[in-house]
Amino acid sequence: MAERVLIVGGGDGGTILANALDKRRFDVTMLTASPKHMFQPALLYVAFKNASRDIAREQRTLLDRRVRLVHDAVKQVDLKAQVVTTASGERYEYDYVVLGTGIRTNPGEIPGLAEVNAEFGDYHSSVSQAEKLWSRLDAFQGGTIALGQSTPVIKCPPSPIEGILLTDELLRKRGLRDKTRLVFFTPYPRAYPAKPMNEVVEPILRERGIEIVPFFDVDKIDPETRTITSIEGDEIVYDLPIIIPPFIGADIAYEPANVVDASGFVIADKNTMRVKGTETAFAIGDGSTTPTSKSGVAAHLEAQAVAKIIAGEPAKYNGRTHCPLDMAFGRGTFVIGTYDAPVRKLPPTRLKHWMKMAFARFYWISLRGWLEPMFTVYFKLTEPRP
């Protein structure tokens, strides 16, 4: 009898895993609240370039026909009884469960941020929020734009740098750069957290006249005075704020409750993705505590490793990251590293930018696993060394 694999979440990790599992051995069911799958990196280009083509597709079209797809929100996961309960009250028993729940924004964590993001939008929450941000940028005629992350943990670590550089590009093309003060704030001691990449990034920001404010931990925002205040009491006054909100785990109750941390992220082994204290539960993607970037590539590689582990094959995820970084004006680079190898210093080139654009085009077929041989060779050739 086929073993039952339950996948919670229809993101890239869950979709890749569902397609990778051998359907002759496993009865695969995916539970996801949304009928559509969104290519989340596209929000960057909705917000800063008004590009909204091919952002989402029907989840059913991305899955092997033998995968059972159920559109229902998961509300409870009982890891002891091996049962998942949905919002409709349905109960699903499993032999293996893979939690690809993703994460959600939590602007209410910071006083004033919910009001600010409701007014100005952001490029990490939704298509509508990204469209709102574009409308604000499109109407902007000069003043101070302040962009940064409100907390250290965000989706796609390069995205703050991408946002500020694409803002700079937009302003220059519209002849507004000399009328604008661009401020980039970060809770880290430098513009990019990893020092080797910062040696690439920070000189470019300074060359383009972007002010860098390090060690800026956002405490509150006053929409009336248009002021962002740090925990240390420093202030940034803005005309247009672009603030990446805090993130928390999915709204799911777990039994036992101690398998999630204070932010709701599922505690998992960094190499096997097994959930704390279990042998039959795994957590992949943004919603886990694995100490790697919350990115599509990480979820992809975690999913491939979990597929092998469930099949009884030896496999480990080594923390590999491969995040594309759009440096604006047709140039780009990648943030590449593993748990054991430090992030590499890779200067931007036009080729790297086009590689990012090409992957966006190939994203949908990559979910089916059809490009896996190519990815395997590419990741091996670009593997960083300790």
Region annotations inferred by a language model:
Residues G10, S88, T101-G102, E232, ...:
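Glycine-rich, N-terminal phosphate-binding loop of Rossmann-like dinucleotide-binding domains
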Residues I284-F329, T333:
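A conserved FAD-binding loop/helix module that cradles the flavin
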Residues A2-R68, T151-K195:
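Beta1-alpha1 glycine-rich phosphate/pyrophosphate-binding loop at the start
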Residues F334-P386:
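C-terminal auxiliary extensions adjacent to catalytic cores
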Residues A2-E3, V67-E162, L166-G175, I242:
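FAD-binding core/adjacent interface of flavoenzyme oxidoreductases
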Residues E109, A114-Q141, E235-L301:
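FAD-site-proximal beta/loop scaffold in flavoenzymes
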Residues R25-T29, V67-V84, Y92, D168-G264:
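A Rossmann-like FAD-binding core segment of flavoenzymes
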